[in-house]
């Protein structure tokens, strides 16, 4: 969430700035100063990449058909359709980070279809992976993270022939190189520092994982 979506007039604009580390530190300082240290502000998810969160989340299948992160489904007027529209960048990104760590039939069962096997989604995935345009104005992960996850799928027989994976493989390797993508993929699974999380909570989370 700390990576911006676009630069404008020399300034970075971040669609999800309120989830960023910079915002977390600033609001924590304000609250601490206003309450004499009585209130703390921190994110329990800060140490983990989106891909790592997906890896942890997929351990429990009981949530498969009740969870959603599709923005098109959250409307003031309500929504009674599918949990995932399958057309927005948010759906495309979530599908992408689950694909390297979840069985294909299970993931397709959650989304209703293989979002990586639809040529119409090519431009969206190019933007998510930094191969075209700009990062989508949605709550999606970092560009290199998406690129690394897509690269991981090029080495999986069950995913390698999907339309998007096979089409973007050469461009991914040209832009980033296999060494950079391999390193990024490994780094995604390494938990970051827990400096802003109270020690007791950090210890309990580490034990649970």
Predicted feature descriptions by range:
Residues 1-209:
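Nucleotide-activated chemistry modules centered on ATP-dependent adenylation/adenylyltransferase
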């Amino acid at each position: 969430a700390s990576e911006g979506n676009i630069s404008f007039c020399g300034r970075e604009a971040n669609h999800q700035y309120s989830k960023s580390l910079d915002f977390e530190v600033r609001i924590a300082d304000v609250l601490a100063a206003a309450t004499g240290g009585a209130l703390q502000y921190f994110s329990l998810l800060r140490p983990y990449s989106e891909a790592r969160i997906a890896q942890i989340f997929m351990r429990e299948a009981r949530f498969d058909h009740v969870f959603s992160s599709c923005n098109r489904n959250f409307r003031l007027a309500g929504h009674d359709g599918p949990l995932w529209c399958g057309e927005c960048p948010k759906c495309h990104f979530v599908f992408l980070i689950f694909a390297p760590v979840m069985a294909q039939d299970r993931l397709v069962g959650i989304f209703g279809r293989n979002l990586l096997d639809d040529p119409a989604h090519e431009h969206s995935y190019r933007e998510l992976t930094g191969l075209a345009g700009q990062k989508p104005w949605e709550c999606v992960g970092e560009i290199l993270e998406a690129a690394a996850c897509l690269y991981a799928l090029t080495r999986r027989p069950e995913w390698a022939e999907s339309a998007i994976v096979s089409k973007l493989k050469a461009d991914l390797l040209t832009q980033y190189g296999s060494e950079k993508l391999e390193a990024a993929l490994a780094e995604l699974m390494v938990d970051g520092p827990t400096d802003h999380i109270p020690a007791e909570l950090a210890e309990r989370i580490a034990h649970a994982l």
